[in-house]
């Protein structure tokens, strides 16, 4: 998160309930205080945008801006998706390196991301390449094994129905998956109906409505619209809904839900009056 009181970009660990998710702040750390291990340089500005908890540790998906010293103050510069690994319950992380680089590596460019799902022993992550919203994947076992050793494993971008997942995650070409919106969000697969769900949002850019939409898929590649969670006109430009997450009914946030789950999303996150809203999705109805 960005916090002027703590000198800029910081990372926060909190505890709470489904009704009060930020009830208790455990700690606030800067990048060098959180990423204390590893052999890869801490290049750029880091935001942990999602985590996957496993029996062996916690895998963090990191949105990286200003990679390779690129960009100007307030700009994204070159952007990446990176990985981190924690074996102490998220109190410190090893930065493993970058796994996704946009095609042709434009500067500036915002890759957004990174919702993920686990499907058929693969991890799928979603991000914006230069073609639009797309997906890359890697075998779960390989990702975790490499992470434990302080490394990354190869990820492959989706490059169309004929070629499939056959393009290098680190700069290869990709094909958009046909839906769009801001992808600083979350995804999960349901044990109730074996479908997966992906959130996308939009703020009030150029006077358009702000919204949170839910999409569904059976394979992680072909997505269709499921429902609008909220849609409204925003009072000012650059206001509205952004940064959404999916939480299971039992309070877990690990890419798996049952028949009922909660959606949380910030509104007007750049304003003093920002708030977090909560909605319930019941797949049995």
Q: Whereabouts are the PLM-identified features?
A:
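Beta-rich carbohydrate-recognition and catalytic domains
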Residues: 1-44, 52-107, 119-180, 190-237, ...
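Conserved beta-strand position repeated once per blade in WD40 beta-propeller domains
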Residues: 48-50, 113-116, 184-186, 243-245
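A short, acidic, amphipathic alpha-helical segment used as a generic capping/interface helix at domain edges
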Residues: 240, 245-251
